[in-house]
Amino acid sequence: MSCSLHSAYLLQNPQYRLDVERRKDGSTIKPSWLKVKFPSSPLFHFTTEMVRDLQLNTVCEEARCPNRWECWSRGTATIMIAGKQCTRACKFCAVTTARPEPLKADEPQRVAEAAVRMGLRHIVITMVARDDLPDGAAGHVARTIQAVRQVCPDIVIEVLVSDFQGRLRDVETIVDAKPDIYNHNLETVRRLTPVVRHRATYDRSLMVLAHVKTVAPKMITKSGIMLGLGETGDEIRIALHDIRSVGCEIVTLGQYLQPSSQLLPVKSWVTPEEFDAWKQYAESIGFRYVASGPLVRSSYYADAVSISDLRVTSDLT
């Protein structure tokens, strides 16, 4: 069977996913490809100490990312700003839901210091949803971008931000700060969005991504979805087309992993072969960079993207 035929077969036969087996205590038994080694290196310890010293939050820790050990051993981390408590309670996310503390005015400078200490060429800045603030912390994100750019003028800055409840002026505040990559995740397919994402809508997320391209046509945009929540192949296909239709050049697809027993259970394990097939499909409909695999997360190996190539592509879209 040819590669393309094999991919089509996988996408049309979701029964080839693995059922989820559970232990007596209710915890899931993960397939072999999801078992992560815990590498330790001088860079891992350096990153750990630097994060503590600068009193920074990372999504690697707060969201219990399975790639933390690998990324920190490579000297990379995704910095989470605007606090460590989120105003939303999405059913896939391990970040604590609570009344957030006030923004810390010196946080942008601390993030910039982290970029300098780590010698980063690519930084990912993400945030908790701050629906308690009039601008959703958009101004704080913009100030962080500017602080990093001031000390690292050649760094690639990627932001992974909320939908700001659909307030396009706040989206424009981020755009005006000129990040290189504007990332906002769709997270899941349309049908599952009300269950998976608290106070978010499928169409609002697409509107945000479309607006970025409207006001900044050359800005690279990115989105991603999780698999294994009960979605169908047709729903994944539609979601990919929807993301591409609003101009996104980059898309990520990864396996949903249940962070705790209080969050949504995994419905199925998606095989590496199916992820490869989705990568081929996404590339076939025009995405310029696709990261698709069981352990892929939105910022996993974000620095592997060739920004110069994507900028040329953006000029043509």
Model region roles, listed by residue range:
Residues 89, 133, 192, 261, ...:
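Glycine/Thr-rich phosphate-binding loops of Rossmann-like dinucleotide-binding domains
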Residues 84, 162-165, 230, 295:
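Short, surface-exposed acidic/glycine-rich loop or hinge patches that mediate macromolecular interfaces
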Residues 94-111, 117-169, 174-208, 222, ...:
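Core AdoMet radical
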Residues 59-71, 82-97:
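Local cysteine-cluster metal-coordination motifs and their immediate loop/turn environment
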Residues 1-78, 109-116, 143-154, 176, ...:
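Auxiliary Fe-S-binding modules of radical SAM enzymes
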